[in-house]
Amino acid sequence: MQKLIQDITKEQLRTDLPAFRPGDTLRVHVKVVEGNRERIQIFEGVVIKRRGGGISETFTVRKISYGVGVERTFPVHTPKIAKIEVVRYGKVRRAKLYYLRELRGKAARIKEIRR
């Protein structure tokens, strides 16, 4: 039974996504269905956490929209994500960047590294 579950989940894992870590700035292209139309919506922000593994792995992206912080959690292997672009690679020393929630303006900047 365990082998069967592993085989099914292995088929659904995505391999077309770039490598990214907390601190990186991503542009996530999400498929949104409105009535009978489907369109692509772009959500750009900083990865503040990545958790889980395998098919249940998720990541959370945070951005500031009109002065209000917006966080959105995506499953990594969902078909709703059309593509992910890495805009910048950030250098951080934590796996979970919850402290960014309290910071405003220039204090919330993350140092960029070249990869």
Curated annotation (Swiss-Prot):
The keyword Zinc-finger does not apply. Pfam families: Ribosomal_L19. GO terms for biological process: translation. SUPFAM superfamilies: Translation proteins SH3-like domain (SSF50104). Keywords: Ribonucleoprotein, Ribosomal protein. One of its GO terms (molecular function) is structural constituent of ribosome. HAMAP family: Ribosomal_bL19. NCBIfam families: rplS_bact. This protein is located at the 30S-50S ribosomal subunit interface and may play a role in the structure and function of the aminoacyl-tRNA binding site. Belongs to the bacterial ribosomal protein bL19 family. This is Large ribosomal subunit protein bL19. It comes from Bacillus velezensis (strain DSM 23117 / BGSC 10A6 / LMG 26770 / FZB42). The lineage of its organism: Bacteria, Bacillati, Bacillota, Bacilli, Bacillales.
